[in-house]
Regions:
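Conserved short histidine dyad/triad with adjacent acidic residue
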Residues: 40-59
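Short beta-strand His + acidic residue motifs that chelate non-heme Fe in jelly-roll/DSBH
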Residues: 51, 72-74, 96-98, 104-109, ...
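His/acidic/aromatic-lined binding-pocket segments of jelly-roll/cupin-type domains
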Residues: 40-41, 60-65, 96, 106-107
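Short acidic-glycine-tyrosine-enriched beta hairpin
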Residues: 62, 76-104
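A short, N-terminal "cap"/entry segment at the start of jelly-roll beta-barrel domains
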Residues: 1-37, 84-89, 144-158
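Glycine- and acidic-residue-biased ligand/ion/polar-headgroup-sensing regions
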Residues: 58-78
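Double-stranded beta-helix
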Residues: 80-81, 105-158
Length: 158
């Protein structure tokens, strides 16, 4: 039995805080070839997850809030936000499923946020994700501007 408890969430959150990318995965699947990828994803505010989609092969992806507050954002082909959901288990907003071929990303809105993520496998880094050409590359100086634009949109809508 794999146990997901406060100790595990604290452990992965602490690793995310120390990571240059401000996030950390904890995989439950044993092999990249597993047909169901399951993981914890600890994300700190300021971490940039470049918008991407999963197609060829198509993959569904679901996110569930275990701790903290996280925004899951969907975009159209031009980079306009089409929909978003704030995941916050304390407000009974637990999760979302993102359809294959859908541009999406996520942003942490609170320190020590952790999601449980489930995605169709297998994982092959060469074809797992298609990154959006309209979004800055990870590590670029424009990623903060992009994050701020999304946060501004979300806060304006609330």
């Amino acid at each position: 039995m794999i146990k997901i408890d406060k100790h595990l969430l604290d452990e992965i959150s602490n690793k995310a805080k120390k990571s240059p990318r401000k996030r950390m995965n904890y995989n439950f699947h044993k092999e990249d070839s597993d047909t169901l990828q399951r993981m914890l994803n600890a994300i700190e505010p300021g971490s940039y997850i470049r918008p991407h989609k999963h197609e060829n092969p198509d993959k569904r992806e679901a996110f569930f809030a275990l701790r903290g507050i996280i925004a899951i954002i969907e975009y159209d082909n031009e980079g306009n936000i089409t929909e978003y959901k704030i995941l916050d288990s304390k407000k009974e907003s637990y999760g979302v499923e993102v359809a294959p071929r859908t541009w999406h990303s996520m942003i942490s809105l609170q320190s020590s946020s952790v999601t449980y993520e489930v995605k169709d496998g297998p994982y092959n880094p060469s074809d797992d994700k298609i990154f959006a050409s309209w979004a800055p590359e990870e590590g670029s100086k424009n990623e903060k501007v992009f994050i701020d634009k999304i946060l501004s949109f979300i806060h304006k809508e609330e």
